[in-house]
Design a protein with these regions (language model features):
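Conserved, well-ordered alpha-helix/loop/beta-strand core segments that scaffold catalytic motifs
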Residues: 1-66
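C-terminal regions of proteins
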Residues: 51-165
Length: 165
C-alpha cells in the first residue's frame, strides 16, 4: 500500500477505536479546476483515489456501521459552477478563483454531512461508487452542453498560466 493509503488507514482505525465521528472528503474544486485536471491528467486517478479511501473505510469497519464516512463534493452543479469572473463582488461569490472557495461552499458541505438535507455532495461507499461515477459523468455532459462559457474561460486560464500569471 502507498503512504497515503497507509495514512488514511491509520486515521480510520484510530477513529473507529476511539468512536470518533470522522468525515473524509477530497477538497471541493470549481468546475474549471476539474476540467483542467481532466484534460491534463485524466479523470481515472481522481476516481481511483476516492475508491481507495472508501475501500479502506469499509475494510476497517469490518461490516459494522461506524463513525467514519466518506463524502465527495465533486460535481457540476451550482455550488461548483459559479462563473468566477462574472462581475460579482467577492462577498457575493461562492468562489474566489477556480481553486479557492468562500465559506458558502464549506457551509453547504457541512450542512450535507451534519444535517438531514443532502443538497450538495454524496456519501460514498464501494456499493454506490459506480452509480456515483456514472451520475457525475452524466452531470458533466449536461452541464457542459448548457454552459458554453466553460471552454473559453478554460482556455483563458491556460493562457494566463502559460504566460507565468
Amino acid at each position: 500500500a502507498d503512504a497515503a493509503t497507509a495514512g488514511v488507514r491509520k486515521l480510520v482505525r484510530l477513529a473507529i477505536e476511539k468512536n470518533i465521528r470522522l468525515s473524509l472528503m477530497p477538497y471541493p474544486k470549481h468546475v474549471l479546476h476539474y476540467e483542467a485536471e481532466r484534460r491534463c491528467e485524466g479523470i481515472e486517478a481522481r476516481w481511483n483515489e476516492l475508491w481507495k479511501i472508501a475501500a479502506v473505510v469499509e475494510q476497517e469497519a469490518r461490516g459494522k456501521a461506524g463513525p467514519v464516512e466518506v463524502w465527495d463534493f465533486h460535481g457540476y452543479r451550482d455550488a461548483n459552477a459559479e462563473r468566477v469572473h462574472a462581475g460579482k463582488a467577492m462577498r457575493e461569490r461562492w468562489w474566489q478563483d477556480n481553486g479557492h472557495f468562500n465559506h458558502e461552499v464549506g457551509a453547504a458541505a457541512f450542512d450535507s454531512i451534519f444535517s438531514a438535507g443532502r443538497a450538495y455532495g454524496h456519501r460514498v461507499d464501494t456499493r454506490n461508487f459506480d452509480g456515483l461515477v456514472e451520475a457525475v459523468e452524466r452531470e458533466r455532459s449536461d452541464f457542459l452542453a448548457r454552459n458554453p462559457w466553460v471552454e473559453p474561460e478554460l482556455y483563458e486560464l491556460a493562457r494566463l498560466v502559460g504566460a507565468g500569471w
